[in-house]
């Protein structure tokens, strides 16, 4: 059900419920944003990502509910497409999902989690996707798997996008048109904050230097490689340039700062993240620096670890200007979460984060 209600007052809580036949839904709660010229006293929001059903229960949501947020931002990997595996905390229904019915069933299964249900009930959500809502590490119309025909992959993308729209709180303007779905958009909270919600999957070129972890060399510097696509990048720059908000928040998926997963002598970086699209990353950071965009903050999910990063104009120069801040949040349940996956990367950070608590990030 997608309801777009008009005529509501700004900056207030509303309660609602649905009737169909003899059935009545639980009472939901949502909040309207302040008018654009108003400076609200505060905005309290949470962001999350990466909730793998089989890896654990979604226990972060009850903590969010206790903190009474104005907004929840989900940065992607709301579901995972993989087949069910035995001897996990709980098991996906069926094989790897490909059909529209498969995707619908997977969303329905995830929505049986009580914590997730309740968080949707008590606060508005601002959502975007990453890769697992469709297929791991895909880029536009390119599968990470060999031997998948373009026709088969396109049909699967149509199914994945349709199911995502059906289950997410999205307006009619995001209604899919076949394999295409416009998800990038802006959301204003008065003059305090402007959210620029991005899509780093649908329009990106294929990973220019291949997938996985590799040095920053060769095709990483491809001038034609793009993370956002030409149209979305132009839209983002136009909105950043026109913004008069105190904070400009980029809600997106993959880590923007470089994370060395190798050694100091032989550094390796994820080619699926922004370092794999170095020209695209530099162009965006340079634009924000030259136009003096007010207080850029990048929200990131994807890698199941907490990081706080300075976004420098040139990451190879320690004295390079700092353009903004990146906040990388750990997973809701997916593997890692500051555990065994940390061993190889602690040395690349000035500060390591050990986990999360109901009060925030533990340093």
Question: Where are the model-predicted features located?
Answer:
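Metal-dependent phosphoester/phosphodiester hydrolase catalytic core
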Residues: 1-363
